[in-house]
């Protein structure tokens, strides 16, 4: 093809792209090199003119709609009925052990997988790499990815010991254009943290253009649209795009535990949760925590017009948020923590015909852009719309939905913000894990001593804020959730800190 034919082809492709009504994307066209023109056209052609036009219109309309007073759902809401709500706190030991046995049975039969939602960057943390690569400052310096990988390894070991057969819990990791490359390299550099490489399956979710408040797609440089992952609800399209369910079905997987990367306390494929859901015959389930206070800005799992969904705190009036049962507990108290159970047939139904019914949600963000002079601008206030789907919006399709309440201090401490914020920071995540390990060690019979050899007294709150009385970290390879520590720690005197119990064959190691 000669240069004139190439130019004609580029111009005709440009005209087709302009059918999207987004002609402003070509305002630097004459300044672009042939390679830059090709890159811009390829990006636009992946979107299709009609889809881009509809996406920008939808974003603009959603922004206008959500900028108005939020729609209140109070009169349409009902709490999760007691018969569909399990609880760690309100269940007897026998019942919890029965669910745990069922969960371990399914894990030992190679029927359980975990699926990590890891498409987001650590922007709010102040880093440019994936959140899973972040270290919150533990004595061991382990990252979120390493902690989670080691929990899977320990869980496989526990299930195998119980049932006398080797088992595998495959780990599916949904990444994005931003996180796939760094995540894959990180795992390769760390030998997949001891997991079989074939049992760690990474796949990529779709990207959508960021849109300005005027409905125009945003350029992040002269030849590139600003793009963002399509939310954690992009999972369902990604499962289809990458044939992930086919992989699961080929392995005999029947149950999938889905969770977000940023919860340092997450129990991977929690046998109690899995067993509860399987025992109830659930096709879809959610772990929840009790709301800390009525106005806590957390979504609530409940029924709306008879179907299950997560209602955002902005959709509930203060009066409804403060409503209480006769026993004094909040009526709408099931706080969503993005920790879910799905059967593979349920996921198959979602990607088969139900996914298009999921609504998009508006996220108002600060989106870097090029101004009319071609200069890169990093805005100090929100200037753009990112459209997202939410993973939990499929609850409405469940035929048998259940919820399972767990203790916040044992299972939920998200990492979202830099340490300049008040909550959900590296410091709060680190403290949550160290407090948990301190409690485990004390229950196992460990004696923590100060520099004079005197016992360190527990603080007034053993679930507390601030640092624990003694800094103690327990490797997930030693204990998944506090089990089996007596042989290492019962009647042990520990006086050198920080203290790390690193592996089941190494014994206690002061750092």
Swiss-Prot record:
Motif: Substrate binding; annotated at 117-120, 312-313
What is a GO molecular function of this protein?
A: uridylyltransferase activity
- Write down the EC number: 2.7.7.-
Sequence segments annotated as region (Disordered): 1-22
> Where does the source fall among the domains of life?
Eukaryota
Q: What family is this protein classified in?
A: Belongs to the UDPGP type 1 family.
From the Swiss-Prot or TrEMBL record, give the protein name: UDP-N-acetylhexosamine pyrophosphorylase-like protein 1
Query: Could you tell me the gene encoding this protein?
Result: uap1l1
